[in-house]
């Protein structure tokens, strides 16, 4: 019932337009509009707004620190790692649990000069993730595939062939993050 009334109110406003009234058959117009309209739960709208804020923040910091050419790589890595969510914890590994948007482990955060306890703070994690990217560039990364490899394997091992299982994982990650 609510859907119909929303369509009706919107329809009345749109049909009052002389262009729409003369150019469109109202029945076909509304059938097409109904097919395009997607009703989204409020929680999803809030989640997408939060993601938009994170995406904008990553874009701003990467542009400032690394340049426009690295924005797409940073966004792909953040999407693969956390879906742009700030309070995400990765699975337990022999290196520890990765945290935040860029899924940094405590030792990486510490090495980069960041407090591991602040990795759930979105701004702090983004700054640490961008600092990691900066080190990767210093170690010779020149393209998105190299950046994905460096993010997953570390700046000392990004361009070497790893043990079979780790190499397979690295290659799958590179394909996801550079697609």
Briefly describe each language-model feature range.
Residues 29, 35-179:
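Catalytic glycan-binding domains that act on GlcNAc-containing polysaccharides
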Residues 19-23:
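Boundary at the C-terminal end of the N-terminal hydrophobic targeting segment
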Residues 26:
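Substrate-binding strand-loop-helix patch
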Residues 13-14, 18:
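Hydrophobic core
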Residues 3-11:
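Sec-dependent signal peptide recognition
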């Amino acid at each position: 019932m609510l859907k119909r009334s929303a369509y009706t109110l919107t329809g009345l406003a749109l049909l009052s337009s002389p262009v729409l009234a003369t150019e469109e058959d109202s029945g076909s117009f509304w059938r097409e509009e109904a097919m395009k309209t997607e009703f989204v739960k409020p929680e999803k709208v809030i989640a997408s707004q939060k993601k938009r804020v994170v995406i904008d923040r990553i874009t701003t910091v990467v542009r400032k620190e690394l340049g426009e050419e690295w924005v797409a790589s940073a966004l792909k890595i953040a999407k693969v790692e956390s879906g742009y969510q700030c309070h995400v914890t990765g699975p337990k590994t022999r290196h520890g649990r990765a945290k935040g948007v860029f899924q940094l482990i405590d030792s990486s955060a510490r090495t980069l000069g960041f407090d591991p306890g602040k990795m759930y703070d979105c701004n702090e994690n983004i700054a640490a993730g961008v600092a990691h990217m900066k080190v990767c560039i210093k170690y010779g990364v020149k393209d998105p595939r190299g950046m994905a490899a460096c993010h997953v394997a570390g700046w000392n091992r990004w361009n070497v062939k790893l043990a079979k299982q780790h190499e397979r994982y690295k290659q799958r990650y590179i394909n996801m993050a550079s697609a």
